Curated annotation (Swiss-Prot):
Organism expressing this protein natively: Neisseria gonorrhoeae (strain ATCC 700825 / FA 1090)
Gene: leuC
Pathways involved: Amino-acid biosynthesis; L-leucine biosynthesis; L-leucine from 3-methyl-2-oxobutanoate: step 2/4
Record function comment: Catalyzes the isomerization between 2-isopropylmalate and 3-isopropylmalate, via the formation of 2-isopropylmaleate.
Record flagged with keyword Kinase: no
Quaternary structure and interacting proteins, as annotated: Heterodimer of LeuC and LeuD.
GO molecular function: 3-isopropylmalate dehydratase activity; 4 iron, 4 sulfur cluster binding; metal ion binding
Protein name, entry field: 3-isopropylmalate dehydratase large subunit
Length: 469
């Protein structure tokens, strides 16, 4: 039998029907639903007189539009409130396996909520009307974002039409150095292969450094796969995966658990499996990363300097650097560790889990917010993450440092709620995108790890965390 990649196994086990042009009908196991991309889909079902094909495939929460402060005042923005209220009504009418509404204890960012509830399991196909659905591939699942029309198709038929991507292996061999996190690995890889490097591919991450990551680290890595242009990112199942899933609310139990684990252990690429493309990196080459421009590929080690466009021979790239420097208000040759910040945001579906908050708290403990830093927002990814952080006293560490301890939600990752940057404000952010205006009109975003963000908060500028006691 031909050796198969993990992607081959996941894809082949979900093909319902093949068309002659390479298009297939692909079965979907889990559909994650939030308030932004679902209203039109639910309306389409109503107009056609349809119901959900499988109510027990749907897990839903409100996240993009929900405020992270002053919950006693409710949702002030009328459009945001309408979207959240509409989700409430649609779930009440159509049903779901689980729904975590605004202010519910389990509410949170959909890509944090799903895994912590055990709604994401190895071997599943997972879709959501959100580009960072690739996060769930960390479980040995095939996960990717879909558009609103596909959201409706999934609701009505439990299938989508798709063409198989090419396969790519990205391996990080060796051990990561102290102070280097999954976020740094992700940014480093994007810096090496570019934001189009994974276009047309489903990426499997492997190698010793990847296997050493926790599930939360793997989720960070797979979350960023889309920023390298990939359709999806995934990590093979191992004991780390199984241990994380065990005991989660929607995980199998008893005999069903034993059977599931037996199957899950097969969700690895076979020995001798051939990938369409491979990249291999030495983990020891990876340092703490900071983006300097308006694309995740515009990234350097913390010890680097803002590049000089005059040194770029490619006219298209040179023009891109010039535009980025103008927007970001930076001068060529400026050391990254001398760039001051105005705002710090620690949160998003990339870095708002309990381990991320622990990393940030370890840096913040015993320090105070720097005088030039206007605000530091700490936004847990879910109500359960917030509860755990408070049990550990992390909230007290942040508050004593002068940081804001917020309620769960997408927050400042994107300018779709009350948390946003003002023009020209410079932000050290643990989110996943640094495009122009992503965090607010004219806002300047630098992507970093939670520890690096916390270091910037207390020093007032980007700082190599390895130099801090």
């Amino acid at each position: 039998m031909t050796a198969q990649t993990l992607y081959d196994k996941l894809w082949n086990s979900h093909v319902v029907r093949e068309e002659g042009d390479g298009t297939v009908l692909l079965y979907i196991d889990r559909h994650l639903v939030h308030e932004v991309t679902s209203p039109q889909a639910f309306e389409g079902l109503k107009m056609a007189g349809r119901k959900l094909w499988r109510i027990d495939s749907v897990v839903s929460t409100a996240d993009h539009n929900t405020p992270t402060g002053d919950w006693d005042k409710g949702i002030q923005d009328p459009i945001s409130k309408l979207q959240v209220d509409t989700l409430d009504q649609n779930i009440k009418e159509f049903g779901a396996l689980a729904y975590f509404p605004f202010m519910d204890k389990g509410q949170g960012i959909v890509h944090v909520m799903g895994p912590e509830q055990g709604a994401t399991l190895p071997g599943m196909t997972v879709v959501c009307g959100d580009s960072h659905t690739s996060t769930h591939g960390a479980f040995g699942a095939l996960a990717h974002g879909i558009g609103t029309s596909e959201v409706e198709h999934t609701m009505a038929t439990q299938c989508i039409t798709a063409k198989k991507s090419k396969s790519m292996l990205i391996a990080a061999d060796g051990k990561l150095k102290a102070g280097v996190t999954a976020k740094d690995v992700a940014l480093y890889i994007i810096g090496q292969i570019g934001t189009a490097g994974g276009t047309g591919y489903a990426v499997e991450f492997g190698g010793e450094a990847i296997r050493s990551l926790s599930m939360e680290g793997r989720m960070t890595l797979c979350n960023m796969a889309i920023e390298a242009g990939a359709r999806s990112g995934m990590v093979a199942v191992d004991q780390t995966t199984i241990d994380y899933v065990k005991g989660k609310p929607f995980a199998p139990e008893g005999e069903a658990w034993d059977k599931a684990v037996e199957y899950w252990r097969t969700l690895v690429s076979d020995e001798g499996a051939v990938f369409d493309k491979e990249y291999r990196f030495n983990a020891e080459d990876i340092e703490p990363q900071v983006t300097w421009g308006t694309s995740p590929e515009m990234v350097l080690n913390i010890g680097g300097k803002v590049p000089n466009p005059a040194e770029e021979t490619d006219p298209v790239k040179r023009s891109g650097i010039e535009r980025a420097l103008e927007y970001m208000g930076l001068k060529a040759g400026t050391p990254l560790n001398e760039i001051p910040v105005d705002i710090v945001f620690i949160g998003s579906c990339t870095n708002s889990r309990i381990e991320d908050l622990r990393e940030a708290a370890a840096i913040a403990k015993g320090h105070k917010k720097a005088g030039n830093v206007q605000r530091v927002l700490i936004v847990p990814g879910s109500g359960l993450v917030k509860e755990q952080a408070e049990k550990e006293g992390l909230d007290k560490i942040f508050i004593e440092a002068g940081f804001e301890w917020r309620e769960p939600g997408c927050s400042m990752c994107l300018a779709m709620n009350a948390d946003r940057l003002a023009p020209r404000q410079r932000c050290a952010s643990t989110s996943n995108r640094n495009f122009e205006g992503r965090q607010g009109n004219g806002g300047r975003t630098h992507l970093v790890s939670p520890a690096m963000a916390a270091a910037a908060a207390v020093t007032g500028h980007f700082t190599d965390i390895r130099t801090m006691a």
